[in-house]
Each structure stands twice: as C-alpha cells, then as structure tokens.
Amino acid sequence: MSIVTKSIVNADAEARYLSPGELDRIKAFVTSGESRLRIAETLTGSRERIIKSAGDALFQKRPDVVSPGGNAYGEEMTATCLRDMDYYLRLITYGVVAGDVTPIEEIGLVGVREMYKSLGTPVDAVAQAVREMKAVATGMMSGDDAAEAGAYFDYVIGAME
C-alpha cells in the first residue's frame, strides 16, 4: 500500500483530516516520483543486459548450479533460472515505482523460500542471483538512484536468506 493510500486509510479510519506529518510524507513521496520513475525506466530498459550479466556472474561464481546435477544444468533449466531472475527484477521495479516493498511482498515473496526448498533449489543461489543483478543494475545509476534501487534488491535478498 502506497504512503498516500495508507495515510488516507488511517485518517479515514479515525474520521480525521490528514495530519501535517502525513502530508509531509505524501509530499516527499510525490517529490521522489521522478527519481523512482527514472530508476524503473533504467531497470526496465536494461533488463536483458542486467539479467545476462548477472546470470553470467552467478554461473561463474556458482558453477555447481550449471554443472550436471545442478538446478540450472542444461539449456532449459538455465533458461528457467534466468526467467526467475527476470521475475525478481520485475518485482523490484514494482517496489521502486510504488516507493514501498508491499508489491514485492504480496506478489512474489510469500512462501518463496519454502517453494524453492520443496523444489530442491538452493535458495542461497537465488539470493546470489539477486545480488548479482543489484551489482549490475546499480552500476548503471547515479549514487542516489543506486541507493534507492539497492534497498529493494536488499529486501528481496533478505527474504531469501
């Protein structure tokens, strides 16, 4: 839930106007909109490069994943791994645009650790894949944008650990 919606819901539940603090938070959210959209455009427009570079780095650091018996062994399974990376990058983009981790949590992280464990997927490798995407993506951004985007990558990584 965005800060705008959350503030309105809270104020309405108490039958009151928005407080000065709530208005300040909404103003900050609106003011940061341009940078959040710029970050989302960078992530979206560079997604193929981010996924490919991060995938290459992951497979170099974790050769066990693409070796016989590994979860990304073979063309089909490697493609599945890259598809999952794309999925997490998309979720991160949603969070950036919303200015909140709620879309990430509600759309994609509920029960993810348990699902990966049941499939025999090494969760630490998934977390490493997100770390690699963070490194590539934030390397394409200014310091402030990288810090903003990095927080959403870190949220996903934390959910995997």
Swiss-Prot record:
PTM note: Contains one covalently linked phycocyanobilin chromophore. The chromophore on position 81 is added by the phycocyanobilin lyase CpcUS.
BP-aspect Gene Ontology terms: photosynthesis
Record keywords: Antenna complex, Bile pigment, Chromophore, Electron transport, Membrane, Photosynthesis, Phycobilisome, Thylakoid, Transport
Origin superkingdom: Bacteria
UniProt-listed PANTHER family: ALLOPHYCOCYANIN ALPHA CHAIN (PTHR34011:SF2), PHYCOBILISOME 32.1 KDA LINKER POLYPEPTIDE, PHYCOCYANIN-ASSOCIATED, ROD 2-RELATED (PTHR34011)
Similarity field: Belongs to the phycobiliprotein family.
Name of protein: Allophycocyanin alpha subunit
Species assigned in the record: Picosynechococcus sp. (strain ATCC 27264 / PCC 7002 / PR-6) (Agmenellum quadruplicatum)
